[in-house]
Amino acid sequence: MIDFNLPEWAKNANIYEVNIRQYTPEGTFNEFRKHLPRLKKMGVDILWFMPIYPISETKKKGSLGSYYAVSDFRNTNPKFGSLSDFKAIIEEAHTLGMKVILDWVPNHTGWDHVWIKNHPDYYTKDAAGNITDPLNEHGQSMGWNDVADLNYDNMNMRDEMVSDMIFWLKEHQIDGFRHDMALLVPLDFWQTIIVKLRAVKHDLFMLAESEIHDHLNQDCFHAIYGWSLHHTLNAIAQGKKKASAIDEWYAYDRPKASKGLFMQFTSNHDENSWSGSEIERMGEAHKAFAVLVNTLDGIPLTYSGQEEPMPKRLEFFEKDDIGFKNYNYADFYTKLNTLKHDNPALWNGNYGGQIKRIMKDDNVFSFIREKDGNKVTVIINLSKQKQTVVSDDDINGTDIFSGKKVSFAKRAECSLAPWEYLVIK
């Protein structure tokens, strides 16, 4: 069985998250567009654009505001450029063979959104009849006071929300959505809209910021976040857990989703800005974990700047240029993306091979993935000490990074330097 309507074009795809504001000194669509050939050469498949919409001025945070305080779902932030500028990105990306998904914000809007004035019933209100910002399960503010919480008991609001999504599918031919805070929106909304959206574009891709397994099990999304595993990886990098903790995720968490994909990552816009870059959180281990998330059975994500690399936290409400210069990790990511494209063992979900653990060890995470005669062996020392493991079968092939032949006979010792990795094809 193939994952819930996973588009064939996504079977061996990766995702690259684009932060337009910080991508170039100018922070515009037109300047980002110049990077498209470079990203194509790096093997990027899906461009996920953080919100590109106008940002509300009312209750704005910082000098530029949050990308997620949207004032108009059918327009673009004038600081980024015009709708036609963005459409030019979509068209060139498609010409290059890449797909485009938009970051959608279904849980709330900015306070300048036209619905605030024309349809106040579209929003959650307190006992005094005032529109509220998003509240937690205890009725307390979540601290997002720059946005107004939408009321999903209002069916007209739901209809308009879907209509705005369809606008982007029909008028601008985007390829899908990443839904912000999808876990805060009722499940039945997703069950309803997936049918409506697929009636417009049958092969769209849907990603949820969520770890609710029913978002996959109930055929609402193709992929959700692998947050639990990500936090485990951070803990391993910091010496708080051992590599064997990954087995626990596969044993107890992964099986709760009977279908679909987990998006795996070492960074994203939230993690970078609020918890630190992958270099800050993972130190010398950051490349080892990048190898891991790009070879596991989820769909991998790379965040803007990781190919530089970028050690700093990007400001969220202010201008803070990534500062691209040398793209020192571009070849590293190109090798990983190329292997995923070319070797069906690493394809996504049921298109690819399952994880088969080998050489089980507390500190070295090793596995094989096989599909239709194709095989990839991954061996990673996830510790800051030298480790030696014993091969439980013959291993022969070529390491994709060094280009050197690798051969271990059954019961042979394999020694690895701290955070060393081998990806053998």
Which residues does each PLM region occupy?
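Carbohydrate-interacting/catalytic domains
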Residues: 1-48, 54, 87, 92, ...
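Substrate-binding/active-site clefts of carbohydrate-active enzymes
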Residues: 2-14, 21-27, 37-45, 51-172, ...
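Aromatic/hydrophobic pocket-lining residues that form the small-molecule binding cavity
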Residues: 32, 86, 158-161, 190, ...
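Conserved short secondary-structure transition element at the edge of the structured enzyme core
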Residues: 290-308
